[in-house]
């Protein structure tokens, strides 16, 4: 068996501070903005010359938070309710022989200053600290295939849950808007995807959850109408 060695070229800075509630695919949370910081010796302006002319990028990265669990020949995709098993190569599961992922993100800006190269990204679906091993520009003529079929994932999942905020949290969000633009929209879009494990959907009203987004512990409860955010705790 041939082994290959790759070097990390950069690291992701993201509002997702833990893997819980990270969208299962890119593009589902449009307000999720973050950055890719290139590291030495790849943090050279010449290495990204011309990249600003592309609107979207493929980010190849390592599933660093799940790689110790090893790979599995079959997995249970959330889109199938978490009960049906599929071959790992027929899914985008993190439990792969080589823990490599790919994400299609929006490129908002390329910032180069001295020995710093930062790519500002949109529609991000990567956890903070994710190691990046490659960047490739997205080519619409070659990679957009409207006639392609995709089995159980032919279309994007519907944003399932209505999300509301208590009056106290709404006031808190207003005071944070200047420092955290689109924070309200970001929380709403993340929770609307219903990040709960498939087997826990349909639980009794009143069940509470929490997730670390930006610099806050966001706490919400299940209600008859959807999700209600009742606490925003600084971390």
Which sequence ranges carry the predicted segments?
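Short, conserved beta-turn/loop elements at beta-strand boundaries and strand-helix junctions
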Residues: 17, 109-116, 225
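Active-site-adjacent substructure of cysteine-protease-like catalytic cores
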Residues: 49-101, 191-193, 200-204
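Flexible glycine-rich active-site/ligand-binding loops centered on an Asp-His dyad
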Residues: 119-153
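Short coil-to-beta-strand transition motifs
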Residues: 2-8, 95-105, 214
